[in-house]
C-alpha cells in the first residue's frame, strides 16, 4: 500500500478553500507574523492550556496510507471537564463581518485535529473552538462547536476519500519520476575538469541525509573554481540521489536572478539530452515582479474587488493544476504568466501552489531563510528536502539583512505632513511615535557626539541641531559602543517600539479607507517599514544589537542582526541535506561559524585549469588604504596602463568604492586618452547591465578597460569566457568601509572568538577579491592576467587566504618589471 505524507493544513485548504485571495485576511496573518499573537493568547490562557501540540496519525483510505501531521494551536479542558481543541486565527476582517461560518477551512482544521486527538485519548466527544483575533481592535471573538468522535472520524475519512485521486496522481508521478531519475545520464559527453569531484561530494551529502551526525541532516561546504560548471555539478548528483529515494524535493536557492537562469538552463539541458525525463520544476519570483494587475503605484492589489486574478482564485486553481500537471513541465516566470492569464489566476500564488507538485523549486534565498516570506507550506516543519545553496559566499550578509530592520524618524514626520491639517487617530499615533524618536535622537547625540575628522562642519546634515542645554526626555541605557553620533544598545528601548507598534492599526485603517489618495503610496511604504521593525523585535535576542544613529534632524533606528548563525541553522534543519557551494568559501571555519554549520564537511577543489594559463602579478609598493588613496591615484593609473598595453583585448579594473573608482578613472582618462574605458554606474537595471557587458565582444578591434566595483554586479556572477575578458586588476584588498556598524560587528566577533577583524573586514574583503579575479579564467582554453595592487597582498595574513592555484604569484617592484613580465606571459 502506497504512503502519502500530508500536512493537515495542506489537506484542508486544498479541498475546502473557495472564493478569492483577500489580503485583509490571508495577507495579515503572514505580514504581522500571527505567531506572536498566538503566543500572547496561549500565555493568557493559563497553566492548563497546552500550546502548539504536535499531532500525527496514519489513516487508510482508497488503498492509500496517509501520514497526517500538524500542530494544534491549543488543547485544554474546560470547567465542565470537556476537552477543547483551540484553533487561533488572526484577521483584519472588520469585527462585524466575523461570523461563525466565515471560513469552513478553520473549522475543518480544528475538526481534523479533534479526530486525531479523540482517537488517541479515547474521547467520546470534544469541543472545537475558533478564536479570532482582530488585529485592528485587539478584539477576540470565539465560536464553539461540540462533536462526537464518530462525527470527527467520518469527517476525516470523507476528506481523505476526496483527496485520494490527487494522492494517487502524486503516487503515480513519484514512481515515474524516480524511475526516470534512476536512468538519468550526465548530459555532456564528458565531465569538465573538477565537475566529477564536485558532483561526487554533493551526491554523497544528499545520500547521507539525516543519518549523518548533524542537526537537520548533512551540511556540505564546497568551494569549486569558477568555470567548471557548478550548476550542473550540483543539480545532476542531487537528482540522481532523488532517483534512489534520497530526497522528496529539491530546492535550488540563489542570490541573483542570473543564477536562477543558470539553474533553469541546466534543467533544460537535462530534458534535451533525455526527452523522456519525468521532472517538473518551478521558478518562484517576487510577487511585485510577476503581478499582472498592480495598482496605480505599481503594488500588487490582492483584493477580489480590485484584481480579477485574485477574485475567485480558489474556485479555479484546481482546474489550472489539473491541466498544468498533465505531464512534465518547467514553469519559469514566462510560463507562469502565460498559465495565469489562461486560467485567470494569480501567477504568484499559482507558482506557490505548483511548487507542491514540482520536483525542483528554484528561488531566492529568502524562500528558505527569510522568517517572513519563507515557504510555510514546506518549512514550518521538517521534510525530506534537498537544499542546494548557490553563491553561498553571499549568504552571511544576506541573512543578516533578512533578520535586521531599519526605520527612519523622517518617515513619520513626512507622513504627518502628507496628511495635512486636522485631527485623526492616525495623526495622533504618528505624533507620539515621532516625539519618541525625537527624544531618542537627543539622547543619542549626547551619548555619542560626532567626532569624526572627516566630518564637514559646514554640512547641515552632519551638524547637531540640539542646543547644549537641552536635556532629552528619554534616557537611554548605557551603550555597548558609541561613535560618530551612533549608539549601540543591548536591547531596543520599549519607549521607541511601543509607539511604533501603536501606529500599525490606525495606519492600516487609513490605507484601506483611502485607496485612491495621492499619498497612499507614501503611507504604504511607512506601513511596511513599521512592519519590518516590529517583526524584527519579535525575534530579537542576544545575536542582535540596537543601533541608533543621529544625522541632523534624522534618527535611524536599526535592530541589527550581527550573528545570523542560529537562524540559518534552524532553516537548514528543515531539510534532509544542504550543499552550500561557491568559488570562494575560504576559510571554511568562517563560513561554518557565521552560518551555524559547525559540524559541516568542507571541501576545496583545486582549479583544474593549467596554472600557466593565468598570469598572476602583484605590485606591493602601492598602498590603497583610505588615507593613501589620493596619493596612489597616478601609480594605480600607470599600473592599469601597463596591464592593458601588453595585449589588445578586454579588461576590468575593480575598486573598493565608487569614489576611488572615479578618482582613478578621471586621472586615467586624462593621461591615457587612447585607451577606451567604460565606467560602472551605481544602481544599473538589468537592461543597462546587459548593455554594459555587451561591450565586451570577442576578439575586439581595440582595447577596452571597464572600471567596476568589487562585490558589485560585475565583480561576480559574470561569465565572459574566451577573449571577451583577458585580464583584470584588483585595486585594494576589498575591506568593507570602516563605519560604526562594521566596528560593532568586529567587537561582537572579538568577544565571541577573538577574530573580530577577520570576520568583519579581512575575510569579506578577500572574498570580493577572489570573486573579481575569478572573472578571467572560465574555461580550460582561456588565458589571462590578474594584477593585484596593494602592499597587503604581500602580508601573510592575506597570502594564507590565497587559493592553491595562486601559488605561482609574482611580486614585482615597478611598472617596468610588470610590463616585461606581461610581455613574457603573452609571448608564451
What are these language model-derived features?
Residues 178, 185, 246-361, 369, ...:
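A substrate-engagement module of RecA-like helicase motors
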Amino acid at each position: 500500500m502506497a504512503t502519502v505524507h500530508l500536512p493537515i493544513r495542506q489537506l484542508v485548504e486544498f479541498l475546502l478553500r473557495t472564493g478569492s485571495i483577500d489580503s485583509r485576511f490571508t495577507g495579515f496573518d503572514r505580514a504581522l507574523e500571527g505567531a506572536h499573537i498566538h503566543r500572547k493568547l496561549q500565555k493568557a490562557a493559563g497553566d492548563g492550556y497546552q500550546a502548539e501540540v504536535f499531532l500525527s496519525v496514519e489513516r487508510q483510505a482508497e488503498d492509500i496510507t496517509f501520514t497526517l501531521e500538524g500542530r494544534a494551536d491549543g488543547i485544554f479542558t474546560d470547567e465542565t471537564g470537556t476537552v477543547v481543541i483551540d484553533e487561533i486565527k488572526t484577521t483584519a476582517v472588520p469585527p462585524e463581518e466575523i461570523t461563525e461560518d466565515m471560513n469552513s477551512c478553520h473549522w475543518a482544521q480544528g475538526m481534523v485535529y479533534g479526530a486525531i486527538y479523540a482517537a488517541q485519548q479515547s474521547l467520546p466527544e470534544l469541543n472545537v473552538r475558533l478564536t479570532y483575533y482582530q488585529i485592528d481592535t485587539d478584539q477576540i471573538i470565539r465560536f464553539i462547536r461540540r462533536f462526537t468522535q464518530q462525527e470527527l472520524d467520518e469527517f476525516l475519512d470523507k476528506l481523505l476519500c476526496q483527496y485520494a485521486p490527487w494522492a494517487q496522481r502524486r503516487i503515480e508521478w513519484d514512481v515515474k519520476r524516480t524511475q526516470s531519475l534512476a536512468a538519468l545520464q550526465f548530459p555532456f559527453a564528458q565531465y569538465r575538469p573538477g565537475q566529477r569531484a564536485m558532483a561526487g561530494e554533493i551526491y554523497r551529502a544528499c545520500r547521507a541525509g539525516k543519518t549523518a551526525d548533524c542537526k537537520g541532516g548533512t551540511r556540505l561546504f564546497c568551494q569549486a573554481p569558477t568555470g567548471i560548471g557548478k550548476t550542473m555539478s550540483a543539480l545532476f548528483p542531487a537528482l540522481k540521489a532523488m532517483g534512489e529515494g534520497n530526497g522528496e524535493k529539491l530546492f535550488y536557492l540563489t542570490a541573483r536572478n542570473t543564477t536562477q537562469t543558470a539553474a533553469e538552463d541546466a534543467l533544460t539541458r537535462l530534458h534535451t539530452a533525455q526527452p523522456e525525463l519525468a521532472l517538473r520544476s518551478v521558478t518562484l519570483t517576487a510577487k511585485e515582479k510577476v503581478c499582472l494587475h498592480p495598482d496605480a503605484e505599481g503594488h500588487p492589489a490582492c483584493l477580489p474587488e480590485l484584481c480579477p486574478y485574485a477574485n475567485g482564485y480558489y474556485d479555479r486553481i484546481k482546474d489550472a493544476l489539473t491541466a498544468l500537471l498533465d505531464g512534465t513541465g518547467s514553469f519559469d516566470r514566462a510560463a507562469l504568466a502565460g498559465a495565469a492569464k489562461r486560467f485567470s489566476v494569480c501567477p504568484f500564488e499559482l507558482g506557490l501552489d505548483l511548487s507542491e507538485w514540482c520536483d525542483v523549486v528554484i528561488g531566492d534565498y529568502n524562500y528558505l531563510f527569510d522568517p517572513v516570506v519563507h515557504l510555510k507550506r514546506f518549512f514550518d516543519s521538517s521534510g525530506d528536502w534537498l537544499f542546494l545553496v548557490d553563491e553561498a559566499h553571499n549568504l552571511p550578509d544576506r541573512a543578516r539583512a533578512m533578520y535586521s530592520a531599519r526605520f527612519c524618524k523622517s518617515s513619520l514626520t513626512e507622513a504627518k505632513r502628507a496628511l495635512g491639517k486636522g485631527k485623526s487617530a492616525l495623526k495622533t499615533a504618528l505624533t507620539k511615535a515621532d516625539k519618541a524618536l525625537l527624544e531618542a535622537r537627543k539622547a543619542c547625540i549626547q551619548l555619542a557626539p560626532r567626532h569624526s575628522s572627516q566630518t564637514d562642519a559646514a554640512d547641515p546634515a552632519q551638524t547637531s541641531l540640539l542646543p547644549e542645554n537641552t536635556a532629552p526626555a528619554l534616557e537611554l541605557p548605557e551603550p555597548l559602543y558609541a561613535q560618530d553620533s551612533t549608539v549601540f544598545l543591548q536591547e531596543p528601548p520599549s519607549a521607541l517600539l511601543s509607539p511604533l507598534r501603536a501606529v500599525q492599526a490606525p495606519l492600516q485603517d487609513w490605507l484601506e479607507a483611502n485607496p485612491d489618495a495621492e499619498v497612499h503610496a507614501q503611507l504604504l511604504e511607512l506601513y511596511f517599514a513599521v512592519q519590518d521593525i516590529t517583526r524584527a523585535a519579535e525575534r530579537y535576542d542576544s545575536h542582535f544589537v540596537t543601533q541608533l544613529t543621529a544625522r541632523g534632524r534624522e534618527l535611524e533606528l536599526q535592530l541589527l542582526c550581527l550573528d545570523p548563525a542560529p537562524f540559518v541553522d534552524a532553516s537548514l534543519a528543515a531539510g534532509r541535506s544542504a550543499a552550500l557551494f561557491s568559488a570562494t568559501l575560504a576559510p571554511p571555519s568562517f563560513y561554518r561559524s557565521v552560518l551555524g554549520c559547525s559540524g559541516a564537511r568542507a571541501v576545496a577543489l583545486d582549479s583544474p585549469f593549467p596554472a600557466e594559463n593565468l598570469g598572476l602579478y602583484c605590485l606591493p609598493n602601492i598602498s590603497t588604504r583610505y588615507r593613501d588613496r589620493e596619493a596612489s591615484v597616478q601609480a594605480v593609473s600607470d599600473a592599469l596602463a601597463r596591464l592593458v598595453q601588453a595585449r589588445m583585448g578586454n579588461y576590468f579594473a575593480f575598486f573598493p568604492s565608487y569614489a576611488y573608482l572615479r578618482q582613478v578613472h578621471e586621472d586615467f582618462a586624462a593621461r591615457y586618452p587612447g585607451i577606451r574605458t567604460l565606467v560602472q554606474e551605481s544602481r544599473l537595471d538589468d537592461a543597462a547591465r546587459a548593455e554594459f557587458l555587451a561591450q565586451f565582444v570577442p576578439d575586439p578591434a581595440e582595447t577596452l578597460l571597464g572600471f567596476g566595483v568589487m562585490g558589485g554586479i560585475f565583480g561576480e556572477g559574470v561569465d565572459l569566457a574566451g577573449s571577451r575578458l583577458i585580464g583584470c586588476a584588483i585595486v585594494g584588498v576589498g575591506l568593507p568601509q570602516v563605519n560604526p556598524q562594521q566596528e560593532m560587528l568586529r567587537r561582537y566577533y572579538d568577544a565571541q572568538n577573538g577574530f573580530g577583524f577577520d570576520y568583519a573586514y579581512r575575510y569579506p574583503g578577500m572574498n570580493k577579491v577572489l570573486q573579481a579575479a575569478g572573472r578571467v579564467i572560465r574555461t580550460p582554453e582561456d588565458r589571462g592576467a590578474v594584477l593585484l595592487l596593494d602592499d597587503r597582498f604581500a602580508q601573510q595574513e592575506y597570502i594564507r587566504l590565497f587559493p592553491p592555484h595562486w601559488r605561482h604569484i609574482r611580486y614585482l617592484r615597478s611598472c617596468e618589471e610588470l610590463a616585461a613580465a606581461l610581455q613574457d606571459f603573452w609571448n608564451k
